Amino acid sequence: MKASRRKFLITTIAFSAAGIALFKSSLANAEWLSADFEPGSFDATMKQLLKGKPIVETDKIDLNIPEIAENGALVPITVTSSLKDIKNLAIVVEQNPIPLAIEAVLMPELEPFLSARLKLASTSFVFAIAETEKVCYSVKKKVKVTIGGCGG
């Protein structure tokens, strides 16, 4: 069957319109968290993240991150927790220009688990924060970023 130019153009325009609609909706979804990931102070980031809830240090969050990072551009991190009813998991790096590194919304059916690679600007405390309905739980570890991987 021979395709006509008119049919080809109509099909191309239809797919282009659908693609543009999908692209615009993905941009709208990306904008709702943009304020959280803007440069700012550590204190302002924590205030925005906690939403007025008290913060409690706990040993029920396991923050697995190296104490010495030879390359601050690729620092592996894994967070797990035995706490129940966690709504959000967040990673905050105290000395980074943008302190909020990760914010993950968890479904109730999921185990609280997060694994990623962070970029650390300098030696800093790294916080893992688990938000529940009434309180936020946290744990922190200090990570030393070395220059050139020589330990200094």
Write out the residue ranges for each language-model feature.
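C-terminal segment of N-terminal export signals and the immediately downstream linker at the start
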Residues: 22-60
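N-terminal secretory signal peptides and thylakoid transit peptides that target proteins
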Residues: 1-16
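An anionic, turn-rich surface loop/hairpin at beta-sheet edges
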Residues: 95-120
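Short edge beta-strand/loop segments characteristic of extracellular beta-sandwich folds
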Residues: 76-82
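Extracellular Ig-like/FN3 beta-sandwich strand-entry sites
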Residues: 121-125
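Edge beta-strands of extracellular beta-sandwich domains
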Residues: 138-143
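Short coil/turn motif common to extracellular beta-sandwich-like domains
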Residues: 70-76
